[in-house]
Amino acid sequence: MSAAAAIASPIPAAIAVVQQQRRGRSRGGGSGAAAVRCSAVAPTSAIAPILADLRLRCAAPLPVLRRVADAMASGMRAGLADDGAGELKMIPSHVYSLPTGNETGLFYALDLGGTNFRVLRVQLGGKDKRIIDTEFEQVSIPREIMHGITEDLFDFIASGLSRFVATEGDKFHLPQGRKRELGFTFSFPVNQTSIDSGILIKWTKGFAVSGTAGKDVVACLNAAMERQGLDMRVSALVNDTVGTLAGARYWDDDVMVAVILGTGTNACYIQRTEAIPKLQHLKLETGNTIINTEWGAFSDGLPLTEFDREMDDESINPGEQIFEKTISGMYLGEIVRRVLVKMAEVSDLFGHSFPKKLAEPFVLRTPHLCAMQQDTSDNLGEVESILSDVIGVSQASLLARRVTVEVSDCIIRRGGRLAGAGIVGILEKMENDSRGHIFGRRTVVAMDGGLYEKYPQYRRYMKEAVAELLGPERSNRIAIEHTKDGSGIGAALLAAANSKYAAAQISTR
């Protein structure tokens, strides 16, 4: 039996069979033995109502998806009207020129968004040759730097960038008289004031660098590059989602939306500037820009369980990033763990003693869920191994393995379907603005992130939700396509599109 077949099996019926077998065995012993066995059996049935309630609350049927999609579109409009008017920040990227394929020359990118930073260079050859060559290098950031001071962090980054530039070979050519230009992917909350400047709001993702909040991160990097003697200009500051959109659109003009589904999640899309009320005071020329939705903060209408609420209450940011906590890879395994904790507390699903490792927050991770759902063996041997290695359950029963897989599927199904509803909300908002510009033609949603790439069930549930909400005619015009590691290349391409040496600025669409 495959894992899919296992989760299709009626778990309550399986519980009843196990109970009947145990009752049959208990009849052969004395009354004392029978009493002990029956008392151990009774709690096992307690998982059935927990599982039934979980199925119901995580089903995310079409009416729930419709409510979420409509609320997403409404939240987008509120965020575009006024800062602070809704949950969605709707941050203008100030990108008014996207790469077209005409760009030529040598450009660099720096991607900072976690415990490593990545530097890369790309040689562009215009429409005919496109990307001629690329090279990249990844550098691990020591913990003391992540918890140090601003100057030390940016000096460390500039030093790594300087060493990388020094290895520039003959296949990369900087035109005479030009300064090297850099696209800076900075995946932390910033108040972006122009294409090449942004004020850090706060550090996240384990960084606690003092003295940076409230400062322009591009100015910090420029100062560090000067201290290193590195003659380079930052021509574009972007977040990873914006970089992904730019990288995908370089190859396909129909890309209008980019979504990252990995450890965290975010989405951005192309927006007409005249439909952004909060920017009207800037008197921008009619055209397009990219809006960073910061959709992880969305929460309106989400079908939450007691396990979601408990996890949120105990998080470092209670009441915040609810959509992210419901659909992203950081949290899906933890939600499943909390369900299993409750089941273990009220039953002997994992044996007569509570598995101590199961009490550790985040011990069960989303890759574990993925591995268990790919188990196609009759006895779910991979599931048994994970339960043993990760939460310390030795020789988990087949029932325990099946229940674990079904709980995982419930949470993954809800996450994927809600992500799909979010995508539809963005597309429908864009359609309402453009009157036929989205669903009247081919439109591409560029996807990146390990959760989307590596978890087939999640990916399938997401696409099913999009198809259900849009219907066959409209959904057939929407292409959801994977673009791997697009943010780094995208930053270099945005540096090229916004180069001070560009002969002309070309609008996004």
UniProtKB/Swiss-Prot annotation:
Listed EC numbers: 2.7.1.1
Pfam families cross-referenced by the UniProt entry: Hexokinase_1 (PF00349), Hexokinase_2 (PF03727)
Tissue expression remark: Expressed in roots, leaves, flowers, immature seeds, endosperm and seed coat.
Induction conditions: Not induced by glucose or fructose treatment in leaves.
GO cellular component: chloroplast stroma; cytosol; mitochondrion
Keyword field: ATP-binding, Chloroplast, Glycolysis, Kinase, Nucleotide-binding, Plastid, Transferase, Transit peptide
Region described as Hexokinase large subdomain: 239-485
Entry keyword Nucleotidyltransferase: no
Transit sequence range: 1-37
Residue numbers binding ADP: 114-116, 263, 450
GO biological process entries: glucose 6-phosphate metabolic process; glucose metabolic process; glycolytic process; intracellular glucose homeostasis
Keyword Secreted among record annotations: no
Catalytic function, reaction form: a D-hexose + ATP = a D-hexose 6-phosphate + ADP + H(+); D-fructose + ATP = D-fructose 6-phosphate + ADP + H(+); D-glucose + ATP = D-glucose 6-phosphate + ADP + H(+)
Region (Hexokinase small subdomain): 100-238
Similarity field: Belongs to the hexokinase family.
Role of this protein: Fructose and glucose phosphorylating enzyme.
Protein name: Hexokinase-4, chloroplastic
Gene: HXK4
